[in-house]
UniProtKB/Swiss-Prot annotation:
Tissue expression: Highly expressed in liver. Also expressed in lung, eye, kidney, and brain.
Organism: Mus musculus
Similarity comment: family membership: Belongs to the short-chain dehydrogenases/reductases (SDR) family.
Keywords: Endoplasmic reticulum, Microsome, NAD, NADP, Oxidoreductase
EC numbers for this chain: 1.1.1.105
Pathway: Cofactor metabolism; retinol metabolism
Protein's gene: Rdh7
Name recorded for this polypeptide: Retinol dehydrogenase 7
Annotated residues for binding of substrate: S163
């Protein structure tokens, strides 16, 4: 019995291995639009796909970021300025893409732009949550809906960058909320547009060293949020908690990997494979920590986080 089971698992693994290595033909004729290309995953993916001969349309937030990217790539790659929080910017970028892809349509849309704030929910105001959701979720949704007719024409791919924290909410501050939203939107979109031959993939990176996970920026944002809280909240948590919380964030960022290609290789596979995965867990922590944690009973996860987390001054 066990021998048959092992044989079946081995056969399934072998079939999956060969199936996932089938590559889409004529990649050099296919256009891919990527948001958030100033730095990090988007920047590396743009250069990676350009080296592969694909037609990369890279959206950057700043002209400086766009210029630096163009200097590192071939003449095939084109850039456009895009602020995903502004409708007029999205409309202009969509028209720009439409003029370039023509009747071929857009093969790949990669929603990569994002920001991050880790903090206690009680320290935030409504607008603090809104700022994160505008970029990470609502901006992504608006870009997708705007570009979708072009992707449908090419029977292409939508690749949305979520996070391992879109599976397990380890902290407050709006980031996890936005990534849970990315997961839900991507799942519903995948089912809706599968009828048109369009595939949707979700990338769930673990900890990687990018501008989003920069310790100095994160600690500064935490201190800024602490300063705006009421005296009552500060008394409940106290300054020692703040210091310990920031140290915990530093410990988390110190474990981040420098090898961004682990993530961009997943993104590239989602765009170029004949049979892309629905979800990609990128990184050892994503596979060995966050993914198993997401399947554990809630009470067990809560207990683990309770005993391992920093405690407020007035904790019971």
């Amino acid at each position: 019995m066990w021998l048959y089971l092992v044989a079946l698992v081995g056969l399934w693994t072998l079939l999956r291995f060969f199936r996932e290595r089938q590559v889409v033909s004529h990649l050099q004729d296919k256009y891919v639009f990527i948001t958030g290309c100033d730095s990090g995953f988007g920047n590396l993916l743009a250069r990676q796909l350009d080296r592969r001969g694909m037609r990369v349309l890279a959206a950057c937030l700043t002209e400086k970021g766009a210029e630096q990217l163009r200097n590192k790539t071939s003449d095939r790659l084109e850039t456009v300025i895009l602020d995903v929080t502004k409708t007029e910017s999205i409309v202009a970028a969509t028209q720009w893409v439409k003029e370039r892809v023509g009747n071929r349509g857009l093969w790949g849309l990669v929603n990569n732009a994002g920001i991050c704030v880790f903090a206690i929910n009680e320290w935030l105001k409504k607008e603090d949550f809104a700022n994160i959701l505008d970029v990470n979720l609502l901006g992504m949704i608006e870009v997708t809906l705007s570009m979708l007719p072009l992707v449908r024409k090419a029977r292409g791919r939508v690749v949305n960058i979520s996070s391992s924290m879109g599976r397990v909410s380890l902290c407050g501050g709006g980031y996890c909320i936005s990534k849970y939203g990315v997961e839900a939107f991507s799942d519903s979109l995948r089912r809706e547009i599968s009828y048109f031959g369009v595939k949707v993939a979700i990338i769930e990176p673990g900890g990687f060293r990018t501008n989003v996970s920069n310790y100095e920026r994160l600690s500064h944002s935490i201190e800024k949020l602490w300063d705006q809280t009421s005296s009552e909240v500060k008394e409940v948590y106290d300054k020692n908690f703040l210091d310990s919380y920031i140290k915990a964030i530093q410990s988390l960022t110190d474990t981040c990997s420098d090898d961004l290609s682990v993530v961009t290789d997943c993104m590239e596979h989602a765009l170029t494979a004949c049979h892309p995965r629905t979800r990609y867990s990128a990184g050892w922590d994503a596979k060995l920590f966050y993914l198993p944690l997401s399947y554990m009973p809630t009470f067990l996860v809560d207990a683990m986080l309770y005993w391992s987390s920093v405690k407020p001054a007035q904790a019971l």
